[in-house]
C-alpha cells in the first residue's frame, strides 16, 4: 500500500515520533496507519504513542530575544501542573531557541530542524521529552523577527506571550519602551495596531451601529443629520481609543499620561533617539483549543463495566 508525505505527517502527529521513524514504520507496514502505530509501540515508543492521543490544551507561551533575533512560541501540554514544571519550562525555552537559531518556515520545518545542543532534530527529541515530562506535548505555533529590535514579554507564567518589533534609531536602548508596549498588548489585546489599519468595512459597520442606536433613542432620533454625524465621529474616536494600540490610553499612567503613540515618541526623545512600532504578535496559551470535559462518574462506570 502506497503512502504519502501527508500520511507521515499524520502518523507523527498521532505519535509524536520523529519523521524518519514514522516513514520507516509506514514502509515496514505497507502504509497501514494502524499497523504503523503498533510497530512504533513495539519498538519501545508505546508511551509516547499512547500520550499523543490526549488533548494538549494547557502549556506555555514564551518569548526569547537572542543575537538580534526575536522568537515567540506556544507549546501545549495536558495539565496546568505540568505547564509549571521545570522540565516543561526548559523544553519550551529550548523550542524558542530552536526557532531563533534555525529560522524554520513553519512548524513542520521546525520539527525537522536541529534541537539546541543536540545532534537530533526537534521531532526526534519529542518522544523522549513526552516520556520524561509525562504528558502529550504539541509545538503549536511560533513567530520569528530577524530585523529591527525585538522585545519579548511573558505574562502570568506563560499564559500570555507577546513579541514586539521596533525600528530604533540613534543607538538607544529601547528595551523598556518595547516591554511597556508588550504589557499594553498583553493586558488589552488590541484588534489593530493603528487606526490606519481599520478597514472601510469595519468603519462602515461601526457607523451603522452608532446610527441605529441613535434611531432607537427617543431623545436622539429626531436630531438633525449634521448633529448625528458629529456624534458618530465622536463614537468613532472612542472606537479607535478602545481598539487601536497607538490610539489607546497608555496603561502605565504612573510614568506617562497620554496615548501609546505619544508615550513611544516621548520616551524615545528622552533617550536621544527615535522609535517606531513595526509589528507585534500576542499568544494566549490554549486559545482556540477545545478542552476535554472530564465526566469522572462516567469514567468510573466505564471502568467498572470493563472489569465485568
Model-assigned labels for residue ranges:
Residues 2-308:
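N-terminal assembly/interaction segments in proteins that build large macromolecular machines
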